[in-house]
Amino acid sequence: MTRGEARRPPQEFDRVLSSMCTTPHPAAREAAQAFLATNPGDPETYPAVAERERDAVALLGEIVGLSSPHGYIAAGGTEANLQAVRAARNRADADAVNVVAPASAHFSFQKAADVLGVELRLAPTDGDHRADVAAVADLVDGDTAVVVGVAGTTEYGRVDPIPALADIAAGVDANLHVDAAWGGFVLPFTDHDWSFADAPVNTMAIDPHKMGQAPVPAGGFLARDPETLDALAIETPYLESDTQPTLGGTRSGAGVAGALASLRALWPDGYREQYERTQGNAEYLAAELAARGYDVVDPELPLVAADMPDAEFQALREEGWRISRTASDALRVVCMPHVTREMLAAFLDDVDALA
């Protein structure tokens, strides 16, 4: 790293179209600043941040249809997904367990399988990029500890058939984990069946630092029953608290406080307005790209995927646009809260300049 790079200012968001993180809500910024030195990993020593974590988990439970949630504010969706697999493995009867997930599942499940020493079985998706239910059913067996469904896939913004996956999981006495890390803050305002209220979901990932407008790091790990956290707990003899179910020891009090502040400021009306605006932006961009002849995947949630030649993609990156590709090389644009209609119009102007 050169000295110039070390002095580089923080990332501006005026051309960021690929990230699932966004600018935090002002109230979340202020709250995070006040709790920079606190550690929710030691709740007896830091009771104020521990209280805020309990309140944040309660509000997340309200969002996902769980009246008595158990969980904590994690570093992000990767940690929450790993913890879901870890809890299921620890509660399973089998010695060598497997995890069944759709091929569209986040790459964090590959990390979880590697770290935890479990087998990851990936089922293909159907023609609309959702989990193929029949393929999932073919992959589960008596050693399956957890079946994974995604509520808002990273690449195409699709929602897997969660109730059907729940039936498959129940048939082999496995947990059902829903990864709603990105989609969890928009799905309450849709007709999708995805939450704890819609199916016998055991665990869920939902990230306030994505569509929740909380500062990074602020993920969420939620469980239906306390036994899930018991399966994760280890003794912590030198702390004021006796046990700890979290993956990290020292954790971000700023993330906890910021998450609670954004939840209090925006749930439900602010998040409803945000969903309507971001979904409208996604539909606008999809329609404009389709009108220009690109093959576009219909945006079910605020994410647009479209076929785009590599030369055009690279030229747009050279213009400063932070864009990414799916595994099948489609252009991927995430319409996060910081993405405005004016930003998308400027992006389209640069697309037109390539013609």
Swiss-Prot record:
Pathway(s) where this gene product acts: Cofactor biosynthesis; coenzyme A biosynthesis
Record's catalysed reaction(s): L-aspartate + H(+) = beta-alanine + CO2
Modified residues (N6-(pyridoxal phosphate)lysine): 210
EC primary class: lyase
Gene Ontology biological process terms in this record: carboxylic acid metabolic process; coenzyme A biosynthetic process
Keywords carried by this UniProt record: Decarboxylase, Lyase, Pyridoxal phosphate
Necessary cofactors: pyridoxal 5'-phosphate
Gene Ontology molecular functions: aspartate 1-decarboxylase activity; pyridoxal phosphate binding
EC number of this enzyme: 4.1.1.11
NCBIfam families linked to this entry: tyr_de_CO2_Arch
Family: Belongs to the group II decarboxylase family. MfnA subfamily.
Functional summary from the UniProt entry: Catalyzes the decarboxylation of L-aspartate to produce beta-alanine.
Full protein name: Probable L-aspartate decarboxylase
Organism, as annotated: Halobacterium salinarum (strain ATCC 700922 / JCM 11081 / NRC-1)
Classification lineage: Archaea, Methanobacteriati, Methanobacteriota, Stenosarchaea group, Halobacteria
